[in-house]
C-alpha cells in the first residue's frame, strides 16, 4: 500500500491523542449478519490494497491452511480446507457464501478482515503498530472481535503485528471449529423453516437478534419460553446486550423459533397506526431476525469449547504482553491486570460462554473518539451506546461518508480535527449566569430564545384565553401563550392581542397558541397575526397544537414575521414531522413542546418518557430546536430532573436535558386566573396520582381525574365531576356508535333518560321546555317559549348577556319570528327583559303559535352559525347531538354562576392527574408558583457545584477596537475619517452585516450599535422593525463606500453609505446617520432625483433611551408625517399649485398636457423592452396605449395624497388597483391631443390594517371626458379617525318594469322617488334609475349618514330614456341602502355580464416574461419617481425587502401581453383595463401571465388576466380587460333557407329564444289564427283557419284588412290580398303540397322570426356588438332591421312580414293546384368553366334564354362575383338554363365558343322545354341548384308592379319618429346598393340613381 500513498498524512486526531487533547479507542466487530459477506469484503480489500496486505495475507494463509489440514473429529475441513490465498486469487474456487458464513470459516475470516482494515489504516498513516498503539487509550472487541483487539494490544511493530495476528487467527480458528462442533443439533422441520422465512425472521440458526424490547422485556420473554420447554438442553439464554433495545438470544434453532412465535403475538403489524391506543396497551414494535451464525455463542451450550481450544492451541498470551488496556466484554475489566497470567481462556470464554454487556463496556472506554474497524457496522452499535456522551465514532471499514452522527474513515486522515460529538449534558444542560442586576439566573436554549426563565405557561383553554391573565404572567417575567383556540371571531382575537400588547413591557413578545385541527380558524387567526405584526404589535411566535403542518405551510407562517414557531406533537411520528420542519428551516427557531399523555386538558396516548428516549438524539441534531417538557409538572423537585437531564439516567440513558418546562393546568388555581372560586377549591381538593398510575384515568376516575373524548376527537383530562362522568358515560354508550343511523336510533330510544340526565348533571341542560315546565322538542315550543328559554339560559337578566354574540343570536331569532308574521320588532332593545317585552308587544297573539317547521330548521341553523359562541344548552337529539353536548365545553369552569344552580359539579374542569397533586393552595399568585420552581432549580444547580458565570462588561464601541481587515474590502483611514470600499473582484462581496459588525465593533450600548444592530425601534409606543438596520443590511456592491466620521476622541459621529447612481461616476450619499452626543440621532435619506437636478432629501430623528432593562431607539415623531408628505409633494405635485388648503372633498387639477410623440414613444419603448421577444416584435399603431393615461393623470391622482387633511404615512403607501375606462363613444387618444385631468377622492375607508383611499379622475379632451381613471391607494397603519370616512360611487344602471298594480303602488309609496308629475301613471312602463350613493361615518366607524341621489327615466320603445323625475334619499345612521335594496328586489341591471359556458383562449393563453432589472427608465418615462422603486436603501427603510417594480409598469407589461393575444393592432379595441396588484414584483422576477376569455358584456369580450411569480407561484396581478371584438357584421339570410324544425334546438335550450318564439307565436295565433311554431315543427300541407265566435271574427277582420289596390289610380278599390276570402267566409284553408313552411306567406315570417331569435340569443349571451354592421339578404333585410334596430315594434314587424308574404304569394295567378309557372335557381359560373365563362358570359347566357324562349329569365341576386348568382324566371326557362350549363361544363373548348354557338345550344333545348308542365321538380345540375319551394320570381321585373302598392302599405306601418338614424348610419348595408347607410347627399344620389326612386328625387330637389 505504500506505493499508493506517497504523501504524508498529518492526522490531527492522532496528534491530539498524543498531546492529550483527545482520547482514542479502537473497537473490532464480531459475528453477525456480515458473516455472509465476510469473504467478499476481504476480497475487495485485497484487490485494492493487495501489496500492503501481502505479508498479513500470506501469514494467514499459511496458518489457516496448516490448521485445516490437521485431523479433527468433526472432519469439517476435509473437503474444502482453508486455502485463503488461492480463493483470493481465484474467487471461483472459493466455497459458497453460506459455507463461508459457518463458524469454522467466518471466525478466522472475520479476524483476518479486522486486522487487514487495521493494517491498511496504519500503512496509510505511515505509522507502525507501536506508534499507532501509543496514541490509543484502550481497545475492545465485540464478541469474537476481542481476538483482533488482543492482537493489536500486543503488537508494537510490524513483525510483532504478524506474530500477534497469527495468535489471533489460531484462536479464531479453533474457537470457530470447536463451537460449531459443540453446537446442539437442529430439530426444526422444513415447514417450520419456511414459516420463519415467511414471517421475515430469516433462516433459523443458533442465534436470534431481537430489536425493540428493553432488557427486562427480553429476560421475561426468555423466561416465558424456557418455561414452555421441557428440557434444560433446549433452553435459550440472553447472550448479548448490544444496546438498550438490541439483544441477541442463543440456543437451539427450534427453541429460538419458539421465541419468534412468542414475539409474533406481541409484535405490532407493519404499518399499523397505534397512536390512538394507550401506550401500555399497544403491541410492541419489535423485530426478530436469525443471524447467520452456526453456534450458540455466549451460552452454556459451549462451556466445553474453551478447554478444547486450549488443548488445541500451541500459543499463549499473558496480560503483561498487552501494551494498552484490553477490556473484557462482560465485566469491562482491563485484561492488562492479569499481568503474568494467561488471558487466552478469558478471551475464549468471553466469546463462548460469557454474556456480552456491550453498552456497559462502551461507557467504560472513556474516550472521546472510537475507531471501529469492523467487520460489519460495529460503529453503529458503539454509537447507540455512547450517543449523547460526547463520543465520536468513526467507522474505519466503510469508505462511504458518515451518517447519523458517525464519522467516515476520512476523518482520521484529515489535517483538521473531526467534529466533536455532542455531550448532551454539557451542551444542553442548564447554566447559571449573572444578569445585568447581578442576580443569578438559569440559562438554556429556551431562555436565550425567549429572554425569560426556563419555565413557561402553555396555551390552554380557558385559562390563557383571557389576555389579562397572560399579561400577569408576562409581567411576572415568564413566557406564556395566549390560547387562540378560545376565540371564535377575528374582532375579539384582535382586541385581545391589542390589549395584551398594550399591557406588557415593550421588550416582551407575544406568543399565540393556535389549533391546526381547525383550518378555517387558524387561517383567519394567522391573517390577523400577519396584519398586526406588520403594524408593529409585538407578536413574536406561535405554538401550533392539534396537528403539525407541512414545511411549506410553515414557510408561509415564517414569512409573516415571526421569530419562533413551536409545536406540540403527540407521537413519535409527529416529532419526526417537527424535526423535518426544523431541517427545512435550519436558521429559524423551532420549539418542540412534549407533554405526553399525562398532560392536563388535551393529551396524547403516549408515555412521557419513551418517545423522547427514542427521538432525543434526532431532536438534538437540529441546532434550531428548543425542547420543552410538560405534563404533570407543578413544582421544583419534580421538574428539576428534566432541566438537568437526570431523568433519563434512571432509564440507563445519558442525561437528556430539556431546555425548559411548561405548566398548564397547574396555574388554574393561581390568584390571577379566571377560574371560578368553586372550581379552584375543587382542584385543590383533588388528590391526583403519580406517574405510574395516570394511564388508568382512561377507564376510571384516577386521583379524581378522568379521561374523556373531546369535541375534537382527542382524549382530554378533566376532574371527575358529575357532568364529566355523564360525558364519559355518553362516550361509552352513545358516541362510540360510529354508524350514524344506529346512533340516532339509540338516542331516540333513550330520549327521556338522556334529557333527564342532562338536566340533572350536565352543564348544558335540555333546551326544550314548555310553559308548563315539561320537557319538549323544539318543534313543540311556541315563539314566546323559545325566546324565553334563550333569554333564561343565555343572559343574566338585567345584567346583560353571558356572551355578546348570544344577543345577536337572540335578535336573529326575533327577526325570524318577525318575518314569519310580517312585522318588525324594535331592534334597540338589548337587555333580556326588554327584548322579551318588545317581542311580545309586537307579535301579539302570534307569540303563542307553535314554531313553523321552517323556523325550527332556521333556529337550529343559527345556533350552529360560525363566528358565534355555541349555545349553552342541547337543543335537539339529532345527528349533531355530540356537537351540541361537547362544543365549547370549558368556559364554565370560569363562570360557575352561569351553571344551573351554580353547581360546580356540572362543570368541565381540565386538570392533569399528575399535576393536580401540586395544586394545594387556593389563589396562589402566579409569580409565586413560577418563582418557586425557578428558585428551586437555581438552588439545586448551586448545590450541584455549578458556578454562575460573570457577565462581561462591554466598553463603548469605537472603530479602532475591531479587526484590522475585512476580506474584499479596502479600509483607508484619514485623520477622522475611515472609508470602507468594496473591491471589484470575481468573489462575492461581503454581506453588509459582516461589514457592520466590523464597523460597530463589540460595543453593545453605543448609538451606532443600536442603529445598526437592534432589531426593533419604538415609535409612539409601537414596536417596529429597525428601518435603519434594514436600510443598511444587504449585500454591498462593488464600488460602494461606507464612510465613518470620528470625533477627536475617536467616537463615531456619523456613518454614510455612498453609491454611484445610474452611470454617474461621482458618489452620492444615499443614507447618513449621525449623532454628536450619542443620544440624539439624525437619519438622512437622499434618494436619486430623475426629473430635477436638485436632490430631494428626507430626514428622521431618533433618541437613544436608556432604561434599567437596557437601551432602546425611540423615533421622534413630531412633524414626521408632514416631512414625508412634503417630500412626496416635491416628487409628484406641480410646484405652481398649493394643496395645503385643499380638503377631502376638493377637486385637483393637473396641467394641460399635449401628447407628444417622443414622450409616448419613450414610454412604449420602456414597456416593450420589459416584455418577452415575441411581444417586443409586436408593434401596434394608431392610438395611444391606455396605460399611458396614468402618466397624463399622475399629478392629479397623487395630489390628494399630499393634503394635510389626509392623515397618513406615505412611506407605507401601496398602490392597490387602477381602472381605466374609455367613455362611451369617445375617440381613443391620439398624438397631438391636449388633455387635462381633474380628480377627487371618492372613497376613504379605514380597514383593520390601514386606510384605503380611492381617487377618481376624468381625463378630458376639449372639456369632454375621454377616459375615467379610478385608482386605490392603501396606506398601511392603524387609524382611528373614523369620522373622516366616506364613500361615493355610481350605482349600476337599474331598470324596473312596472308590470302590476302592486309594483306601481310600491314605487309610488317610496318617499325617495320624486316624480316631475306626481299624478303620472306608471303602469306598463319600464323605468331606468341612474343613482349615486354617498355614505359618511361617525367617530365609531358606523354609518353616519346615507345619501342616494339620481334621476329616474322612462325607457321608450325607441330605446331612448326620457327623464320623468329624480331620486333623493338621506338618512342618518342607516343600516343598508333602502333604495338599492328595493331596486335589487324589484329590478335588474341594464347591462349584465354573460359568463361563457366554456371560458378559455386558444393561443397565447400563457405568456412568460421577466420583470425589468431596474426601474429607473420607467420612472423617468412615467414621471413616477417614487424612490421605493429605484433606491434600495429607501425601499428597505420604508419596510420593503428591496426595490419593487412599479405596479403600473407591471400592469403595462401584462396589458401588452393581452393586447398581443387579442390582436389589437391599432389599440382601438381596449375599452377598459382594471388591474389589482396582489403581490410585489421584484426586479428580474419571472412572471407567468395567464389570460382567459370568461364572459361577454354588451358585445365586448371580458378577459380575465392573472400574473404569477413563476418561481413561487404567488399571484401578483389580477386584472380584467374589456375588449371590443374585431369589427363584426351580422348577416341575415333570405327565403329558401327554411327547413322543418328550424330553430327548435335553440328554443328548447335557451330561455330567451323560447320567450321570443312564444311571443311571436302568441301574436300570430291571436291576430291570424295560426301557430307558427306548429308550422315549423310539423310543416303541414294544409291549414284551415276557422272564423267562428268573437275571436274568429276578429281574426277574419285582420285578414280582410290586409288589402291591395286594384290599380294605382286614385279611385282604385281595395281588395283583400287573400284570394277567395270574403266578409262572410266561415273559414279559410291554406295548402301547399311541399308543406306550408315552403309557402311564401308562412316561410317569410318563420324565417324572419327564427333569425331574430338567433340574434336575441346572441344578444342575451352578450356577444352582439352595438356598433356592428348588419345586412339582410332579400327577406333577411326585414329580420336584420327588426333585430338590430327599434324602427318598428316586434309585433308590427311580424304583421308586415306576414303581409309581404301573403302579397307575394298572391302576386301571380295560380292554377287549380295552387301552382305558378315561376321559380328561382342559384348558379355558379365557375363550375361551368374555369376559363372564359365569367359573370359577363353568364349574363349573356341568361339574356339568350330570355330572348329565345320569350319567357322570364333574369339574374336577380348578385351574391358572390363569378361564383354565385340567383336567377328568377319561368320554370321552362330555368330548366333550359340548367341544361345549357351542363352542356357547357362538358365542352372541351368553351373559350372558343361564339355567341351563335351559345345561341344554338339554347335553342336545342327549347322544344323539350315546351313539353314540360309546372309540376316538374327541377333537379340540380353541374352549376345550378333549383330553389324548390319558391314559386315566386322575387326581385324580378315581373313584381315591379307591386312596388308602389307595397310602398304605400309600408308607409302606413312605419312611424317616422321611431326611426333613429344612429341605429342605421354606418351600420346598415341595404341590399339595393351594398354600401353602409348614410344621410349624406352623395349617398342619396347614388341610391336614387340605382333605384330611380321618385321620392328620393324629390328629396334631392328639396335639399338643393
From Swiss-Prot:
Keywords assigned by UniProt, alphabetized: Hydrolase, Lyase, Multifunctional enzyme, NAD, NADP, Oxidoreductase, Transferase
InterPro entries assigned to the protein according to its UniProt record, in alphabetical order: Ac_transferase_dom_sf (IPR001227), Acyl_transferase_dom (IPR014043), Acyl_Trfase/lysoPLipase (IPR016035), Aldolase_TIM (IPR013785), FAS1-like_DH_region (IPR039569), Fas1/AflB-like (IPR016452), Fas1/AflB-like_central (IPR013565), FAS_meander (IPR040883)
EC number: 2.3.1.86, 3.1.2.14, 4.2.1.59, 1.3.1.9
Annotated region described as Malonyl/palmitoyl transferase (MT/PT) domain, given as residue ranges: 1530-1893
Catalytic activity: acetyl-CoA + n malonyl-CoA + 2n NADPH + 4n H(+) = a long-chain-acyl-CoA + n CoA + n CO2 + 2n NADP(+); holo-[ACP] + acetyl-CoA = acetyl-[ACP] + CoA; holo-[ACP] + malonyl-CoA = malonyl-[ACP] + CoA; a (3R)-hydroxyacyl-[ACP] = a (2E)-enoyl-[ACP] + H2O
Annotated spans, Dehydratase (DH) domain: 1001-1491
Pfam families, per the entry: Acyl_transf_1 (PF00698), Fas1-AflB-like_hel (PF08354), FAS1_DH_region (PF13452), FAS1_thioest_ins (PF22235), FAS_meander (PF17951), MaoC_dehydratas (PF01575), SAT (PF16073)
The protein's annotated pathway: Mycotoxin biosynthesis
Segments forming domain MaoC-like: 1399-1512
One Gene Ontology term of the molecular function aspect: [acyl-carrier-protein] S-malonyltransferase activity
Domain of life, source organism: Eukaryota
Protein induction: Expression is positively regulated by the dothistromin-specific transcription factors aflR and aflJ.
CDD domains, sorted: FAS_MaoC
Keyword Oxidoreductase: yes
Region (Enoyl reductase (ER) domain): 447-691
Assigned GO CC terms: fatty acid synthase complex
GO-annotated biological processes: fatty acid biosynthetic process
Region of interest: Acetyltransferase (AT) domain: 24-395
PANTHER family in alphabetical order: FATTY ACID SYNTHASE SUBUNIT BETA (PTHR10982:SF21), MALONYL COA-ACYL CARRIER PROTEIN TRANSACYLASE (PTHR10982)
Membership in a protein family: Belongs to the fungal fatty acid synthetase subunit beta family.
Subunit: [Alpha(6)beta(6)] hexamers of two multifunctional subunits (alpha and beta).
Function comment: Fatty acid synthase beta subunit; part of the fragmented gene cluster that mediates the biosynthesis of dothistromin (DOTH), a polyketide toxin very similar in structure to the aflatoxin precursor, versicolorin B. The first step of the pathway is the conversion of acetate to norsolorinic acid (NOR) and requires the fatty acid synthase subunits hexA and hexB, as well as the polyketide synthase pksA. PksA combines a hexanoyl starter unit and 7 malonyl-CoA extender units to synthesize the precursor NOR.
Record-given protein name: Fatty acid synthase beta subunit hexB
Biological source species: Dothistroma septosporum (strain NZE10 / CBS 128990)
Gene responsible for this protein: hexB
Amino acid at each position: 500500500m505504500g506505493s499508493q500513498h506517497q504523501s504524508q498524512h498529518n492526522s490531527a486526531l492522532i496528534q491530539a491523542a498524543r498531546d492529550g487533547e483527545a482520547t482514542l479507542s479502537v473497537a473490532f466487530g464480531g459475528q453477525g449478519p456480515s458473516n455472509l459477506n465476510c469473504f467478499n469484503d476481504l476480497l475487495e480489500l485485497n484487490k485494492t490494497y493487495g501489496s500492503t496486505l501481502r505479508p498479513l495475507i500470506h501469514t494467514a494463509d499459511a496458518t489457516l491452511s496448516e490448521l485445516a489440514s490437521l485431523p479433527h473429529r468433526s472432519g469439517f475441513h476435509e473437503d474444502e480446507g482453508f486455502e485463503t490465498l488461492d480463493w483470493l486469487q481465484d474467487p471461483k474456487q472459493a466455497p459458497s457464501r453460506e459455507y463461508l458464513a459457518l463458524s469454522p470459516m467466518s471466525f478466522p475470516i472475520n479476524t483476518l478482515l479486522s486486522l487487514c482494515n487495521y493494517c491498511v489504516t496504519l500503512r496509510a498513516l505511515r505509522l507502525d503498530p507501536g506508534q499507532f498503539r501509543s496514541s490509543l487509550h484502550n481497545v475492545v472487541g465485540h464478541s469474537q472481535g476481542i481476538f483482533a483487539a488482543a492482537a493489536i494490544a500486543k503488537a508494537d511493530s510490524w513483525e510483532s503485528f504478524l506474530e500477534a495476528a497469527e495468535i489471533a487467527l489460531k484462536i479464531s480458528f479453533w474457537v470457530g471449529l470447536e463451537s460449531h462442533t459443540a453446537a446442539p443439533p437442529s430439530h426444526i422441520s422444513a415447514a417450520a423453516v419456511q414459516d420463519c422465512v415467511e414471517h421475515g425472521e430469516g433462516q433459523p440458526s443458533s442465534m436470534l437478534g431481537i430489536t425493540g424490547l428493553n432488557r427486562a422485556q427480553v429476560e421475561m420473554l426468555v423466561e416465558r419460553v424456557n418455561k414452555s420447554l421441557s428440557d434444560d438442553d433446549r433452553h435459550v439464554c440472553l447472550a448479548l446486550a448490544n444496546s438498550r433495545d438490541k439483544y441477541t438470544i442463543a440456543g437451539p434453532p427450534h427453541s429460538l423459533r419458539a421465541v419468534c412465535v412468542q414475539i409474533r403475538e406481541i409484535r405490532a403489524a407493519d404499518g399499523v397506526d397505534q397512536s390512538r391506543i394507550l401506550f401500555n396497551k399497544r403491541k410492541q414494535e419489535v423485530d426478530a431476525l436469525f443471524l447467520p451464525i452456526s453456534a450458540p455463542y455466549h451460552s452454556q451450550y459451549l462451556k466445553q469449547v474453551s478447554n478444547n481450544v486450549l488443548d488445541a492451541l500451541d500459543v499463549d498470551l499473558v496480560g503483561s504482553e498487552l501494551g494498552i488496556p484490553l477490556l473484557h466484554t462482560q465485566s469491562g475489566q482491563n485484561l492488562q491486570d492479569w499481568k503474568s497470567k494467561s488471558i487466552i481462556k478469558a478471551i475464549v470464554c468471553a466469546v463462548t460462554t460469557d454474556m456480552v454487556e456491550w453498552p456497559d463496556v462502551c461507557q467504560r472506554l472513556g474516550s472521546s473518539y472510537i475507531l471501529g474497524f469492523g467487520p460489519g457496522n460495529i460503529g453503529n452499535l458503539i454509537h447507540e451506546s455512547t450517543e449523547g456522551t460526547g463520543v465520536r465514532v468513526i467507522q474505519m471499514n466503510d469508505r462511504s461518508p458518515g451518517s447519523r452522527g458517525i464519522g467516515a474513515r476520512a476523518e482520521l486522515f484529515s489535517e483538521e480535527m473531526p467534529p466533536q460529538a455532542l455531550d448532551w449534558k454539557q451542551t444542553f444542560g442548564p447554566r447559571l449566569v449573572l444578569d445585568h442586576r447581578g442576580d443569578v439566573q438559569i440559562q438554556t436554549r429556551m431562555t436565550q430564545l425567549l429572554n425569560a426563565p426556563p419555565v413557561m405557561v402553555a396555551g390552554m383553554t380557558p385559562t390563557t384565553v383571557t389576555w389579562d391573565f397572560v399579561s400577569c404572567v408576562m409581567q411576572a417575567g415568564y413566557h406564556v401563550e395566549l390560547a387562540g383556540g378560545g376565540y371564535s371571531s377575528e374582532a375579539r382575537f384582535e382586541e385581545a392581542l391589542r390589549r395584551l400588547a398594550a399591557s406588557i413591557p415593550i421588550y416582551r413578545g407575544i406568543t399565540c397558541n393556535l389549533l391546526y385541527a381547525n383550518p378555517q380558524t387558524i387561517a383567519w387567526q394567522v391573517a390577523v397575526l400577519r396584519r398586526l405584526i406588520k403594524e408593529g404589535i409585538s407578536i413574536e411566535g406561535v405554538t401550533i397544537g392539534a396537528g403539525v403542518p407541512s414545511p411549506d405551510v410553515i414557510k408561509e407562517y415564517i414569512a409573516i414575521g415571526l421569530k419562533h414557531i413551536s409545536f406540540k406533537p403527540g407521537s413519535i411520528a409527529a416529532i419526526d414531522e417537527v424535526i423535518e420542519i426544523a431541517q427545512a428551516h435550519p436558521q429559524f427557531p423551532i420549539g418542540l413542546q412534549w407533554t405526553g399523555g399525562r398532560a392536563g386538558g388535551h393529551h396524547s396516548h403516549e408515555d412521557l418518557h419513551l418517545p423522547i428516549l427514542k427521538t432525543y438524539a434526532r431532536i438534538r441534531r437540529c441546532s434550531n430546536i428548543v425542547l420543552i417538557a410538560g405534563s404533570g409538572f407543578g413544582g421544583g423537585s419534580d421538574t428539576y430532573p428534566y432541566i438537568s437531564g437526570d431523568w433519563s439516567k434512571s432509564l440507563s440513558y445519558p442525561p437528556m436535558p430539556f431546555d425548559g418546562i411548561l405548566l398548564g393546568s397547574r396555574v388554574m388555581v393561581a390568584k390571577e386566573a379566571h377560574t371560578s372560586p368553586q372550581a379552584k377549591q375543587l382542584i385543590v381538593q383533588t388528590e391526583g396520582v403519580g406517574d405510574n398510575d395516570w394511564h388508568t384515568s382512561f377507564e376510571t376516575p384516577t386521583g379524581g381525574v378522568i379521561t374523556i373524548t373531546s369535541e375534537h376527537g382527542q382524549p382530554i383530562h378533566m376532574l371527575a365531576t358529575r357532568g364529566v362522568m355523564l360525558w364519559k358515560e355518553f362516550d361509552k354508550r352513545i358516541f362510540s356508535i360510529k354508524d350514524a343511523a344506529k346512533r340516532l336510533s339509540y338516542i331516540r330510544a333513550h330520549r327521556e333518560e338522556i334529557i333527564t340526565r342532562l338536566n340533572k348533571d350536565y352543564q348544558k341542560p335540555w333546551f326544550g321546555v314548555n310553559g308548563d315546565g315539561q320537557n319538549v322538542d323544539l318543534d313543540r315550543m311556541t315563539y314566546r317559549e323559545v325566546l324565553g328559554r334563550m333569554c333564561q339560559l343565555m343572559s343574566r337578566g338585567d345584567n346583560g348577556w353571558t356572551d355578546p354574540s348570544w344577543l345577536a343570536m337572540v335578535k336573529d331569532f326575533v327577526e325570524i319570528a318577525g318575518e314569519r308574521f310580517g312585522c318588525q320588532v324594535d331592534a334597540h332593545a338589548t337587555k333580556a327583559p326588554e327584548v322579551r317585552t318588545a317581542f311580545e308587544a309586537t307579535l301579539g297573539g302570534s307569540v303563542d303559535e307553535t314554531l313553523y317547521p321552517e323556523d325550527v330548521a332556521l333556529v337550529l341553523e343559527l345556533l350552529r352559525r360560525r363566528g358565534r359562541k355555541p349555545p349553552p344548552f342541547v337543543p335537539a337529539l339529532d345527528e349533531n347531538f355530540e356537537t351540541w353536548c361537547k362544543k365549547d365545553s370549558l368556559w364554565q369552569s370560569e363562570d360557575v354562576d352561569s351553571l344551573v344552580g351554580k353547581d360546580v359539579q356540572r362543570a368541565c374542569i381540565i386538570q392533569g392527574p399528575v399535576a393536580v397533586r401540586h395544586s394545594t393552595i387556593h389563589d396562589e399568585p402566579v409569580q409565586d408558583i413560577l418563582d418557586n420552581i425557578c428558585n428551586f432549580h437555581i438552588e439545586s444547580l448551586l448545590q450541584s457545584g455549578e458556578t454562575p458565570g460573570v457577565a462581561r462588561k462591554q466598553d463603548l464601541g469605537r472603530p479602532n477596537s475591531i479587526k484590522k481587515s475585512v476580506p474584499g474590502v479596502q479600509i483607508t483611514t484619514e485623520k477622522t475619517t475611515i472609508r470602507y470600499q468594496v473591491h471589484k473582484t470575481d468573489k462575492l462581496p461581503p454581506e453588509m452585516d459582516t461589514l457592520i459588525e466590523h464597523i460597530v465593533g463589540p460595543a453593545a450600548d453605543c448609538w451606532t450599535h443600536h442603529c445598526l444592530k437592534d432589531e426593533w425601534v419604538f415609535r409612539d409606543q409601537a414596536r417596529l422593525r429597525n428601518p435603519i438596520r434594514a436600510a443598511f443590511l444587504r449585500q454591498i456592491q462593488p464600488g460602494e463606500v461606507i464612510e465613518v466620521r470620528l470625533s477627536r476622541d475617536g467616537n463615531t459621529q456619523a456613518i454614510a453609505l455612498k453609491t454611484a447612481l445610474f452611470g454617474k461616476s461621482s458618489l452620492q450619499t444615499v443614507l447618513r446617520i449621525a449623532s454628536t452626543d450619542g443620544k440624539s440621532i439624525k437619519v438622512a435619506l437622499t434618494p436619486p432625483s430623475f426629473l430635477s437636478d436638485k436632490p430631494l432629501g428626507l430626514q428622521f430623528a431618533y433618541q437613544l433611551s436608556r432604561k434599567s432593562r437596557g437601551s432602546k431607539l425611540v423615533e421622534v415623531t413630531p412633524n414626521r408625517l408632514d416631512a414625508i408628505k412634503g417630500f412626496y409633494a416635491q416628487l409628484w405635485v406641480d410646484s405652481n399649485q398649493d394643496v395645503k388648503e385643499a380638503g377631502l372633498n376638493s377637486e385637483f387639477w393637473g396641467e394641460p398636457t399635449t401628447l407628444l410623440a417622443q414622450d409616448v414613444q419613450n414610454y412604449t419603448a420602456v414597456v416593450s423592452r420589459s416584455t418577452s421577444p415575441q411581444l417586443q416584435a409586436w408593434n401596434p399603431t394608431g392610438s395611444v396605449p391606455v396605460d399611458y393615461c396614468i402618466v397624463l393623470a399622475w399629478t392629479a391622482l397623487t395630489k390628494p395624497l399630499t393634503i394635510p387633511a389626509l392623515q397618513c404615512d406615505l412611506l407605507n403607501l401601496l398602490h392597490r388597483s387602477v381602472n381605466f375606462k374609455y367613455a362611451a363613444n369617445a375617440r381613443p387618444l391620439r398624438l397631438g391631443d391636449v388633455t387635462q385631468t381633474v380628480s377627487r377622492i371618492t372613497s376613504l375607508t379605514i380597514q383593520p390594517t390601514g386606510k384605503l383611499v380611492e381617487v377618481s379622475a376624468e381625463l378630458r379632451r376639449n372639456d369632454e371626458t375621454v377616459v375615467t381613471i379610478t385608482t386605490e391607494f392603501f396606506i398601511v397603519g392603524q387609524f382611528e379617525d373614523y369620522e373622516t370616512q366616506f364613500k361615493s360611487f355610481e350605482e349600476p344602471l337599474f331598470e324596473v318594469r312596472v308590470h302590476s298594480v302592486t309594483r306601481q303602488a310600491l314605487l309610488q309609496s317610496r318617499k325617495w322617488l320624486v316624480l316631475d308629475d306626481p299624478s303620472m301613471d306608471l303602469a306598463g312602463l319600464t323605468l331606468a334609475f341612474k343613482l349615486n350613493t354617498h355614505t359618511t361615518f361617525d367617530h365609531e366607524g358606523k354609518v353616519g349618514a346615507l345619501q342616494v341621489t339620481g334621476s329616474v327615466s322612462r325607457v321608450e320603445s325607441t330605446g331612448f330614456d326620457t327623464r320623468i323625475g329624480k331620486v333623493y334619499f338621506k338618512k342618518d345612521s342607516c343600516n343598508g341602502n333602502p333604495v338599492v335594496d328595493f331596486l335589487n328586489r324589484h329590478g335588474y341591471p341594464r347591462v349584465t355580464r354573460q359568463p361563457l359556458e366554456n371560458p378559455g383562449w386558444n393561443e397565447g393563453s400563457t405568456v412568460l416574461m421577466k420583470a425589468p432589472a431596474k426601474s429607473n427608465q420607467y420612472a423617468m418615462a412615467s414621471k413616477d419617481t417614487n424612490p421605493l422603486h429605484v433606491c434600495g436603501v429607501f425601499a428597505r427603510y420604508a419596510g420593503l425587502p428591496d426595490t419593487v417594480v412599479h405596479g403600473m409598469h407591471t400592469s403595462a407589461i401584462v396589458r401588452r401581453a393581452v393586447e398581443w393575444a387579442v390582436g389589437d393592432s391599432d389599440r382601438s379595441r381596449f375599452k377598459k383595463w382594471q388591474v389589482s396588484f396582489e403581490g410585489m414584483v421584484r426586479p428580474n422576477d419571472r412572471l407567468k401571465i395567464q389570460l382567459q376569455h370568461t364572459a361577454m358584456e354588451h358585445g365586448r369580450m371580458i378577459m380575465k388576466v392573472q400574473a404569477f411569480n413563476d418561481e413561487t407561484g404567488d399571484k401578483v396581478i389580477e386584472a380584467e380587460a374589456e375588449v371590443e371584438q374585431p369589427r363584426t357584421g351580422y348577416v341575415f339570410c333570405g327565403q329558401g333557407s327554411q327547413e322543418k324544425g328550424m330553430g327548435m334546438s335553440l328554443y328548447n335550450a335557451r330561455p330567451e329564444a323560447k320567450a321570443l318564439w312564444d311571443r311571436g307565436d302568441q301574436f300570430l295565433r291571436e291576430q291570424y289564427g295560426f301557430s307558427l311554431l306548429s308550422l315549423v315543427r310539423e310543416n303541414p300541407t294544409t291549414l284551415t283557419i276557422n272564423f267562428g265566435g268573437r275571436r274568429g271574427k276578429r281574426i277574419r277582420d285582420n285578414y280582410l284588412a290586409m288589402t291591395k289596390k286594384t290599380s294605382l289610380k286614385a279611385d282604385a278599390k281595395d281588395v283583400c290580398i287573400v284570394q277567395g276570402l270574403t266578409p262572410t267566409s266561415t273559414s279559410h284553408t291554406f295548402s301547399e303540397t311541399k308543406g306550408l313552411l315552403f309557402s311564401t306567406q308562412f316561410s317569410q315570417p318563420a324565417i324572419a322570426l327564427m333569425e331574430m331569435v338567433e340574434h336575441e340569443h346572441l344578444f342575451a349571451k352578450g356577444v352582439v356588438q352595438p356598433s356592428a354592421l348588419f345586412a339582410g339578404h332579400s327577406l333577411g333585410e326585414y329580420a336584420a332591421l327588426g333585430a338590430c334596430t327599434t324602427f318598428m315594434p316586434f309585433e308590427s314587424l311580424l304583421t308586415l312580414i306576414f303581409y309581404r308574404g301573403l302579397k307575394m304569394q298572391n302576386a301571380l295567378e295560380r292554377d287549380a293546384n295552387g301552382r305558378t309557372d315561376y321559380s328561382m335557381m342559384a348558379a355558379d359560373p365557375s363550375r361551368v368553366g374555369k376559363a372564359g365563362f365569367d359573370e359577363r358570359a353568364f349574363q349573356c347566357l341568361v339574356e339568350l334564354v330570355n330572348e329565345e324562349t320569350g319567357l322570364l329569365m333574369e339574374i336577380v341576386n348578385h351574391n358572390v362575383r363569378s361564383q354565385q348568382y340567383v336567377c328568377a324566371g319561368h320554370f321552362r326557362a330555368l330548366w333550359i338554363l340548367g341544361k345549357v350549363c351542363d352542356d357547357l361544363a362538358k365542352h372541351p373548348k368553351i373559350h372558343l365558343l361564339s355567341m351563335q354557338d351559345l345561341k344554338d345550344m339554347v335553342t336545342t333545348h327549347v322544344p323539350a322545354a315546351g313539353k314540360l308542365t309546372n309540376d316538374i321538380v327541377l333537379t340540380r345540375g353541374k352549376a345550378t341548384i333549383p330553389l324548390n319551394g319558391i314559386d315566386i320570381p322575387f326581385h324580378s321585373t315581373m313584381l315591379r308592379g307591386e312596388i308602389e302598392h307595397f310602398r304605400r302599405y309600408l308607409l302606413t306601418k312605419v312611424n317616422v319618429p321611431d326611426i333613429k338614424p344612429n341605429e342605421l348610419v354606418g351600420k346598415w348595408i341595404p341590399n339595393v346598393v351594398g354600401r353602409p347607410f348614410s344621410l349624406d347627399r352623395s349617398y342619396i344620389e347614388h341610391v336614387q340613381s340605382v333605384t330611380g326612386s321618385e321620392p328620393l328625387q324629390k328629396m334631392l330637389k328639396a335639399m338643393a
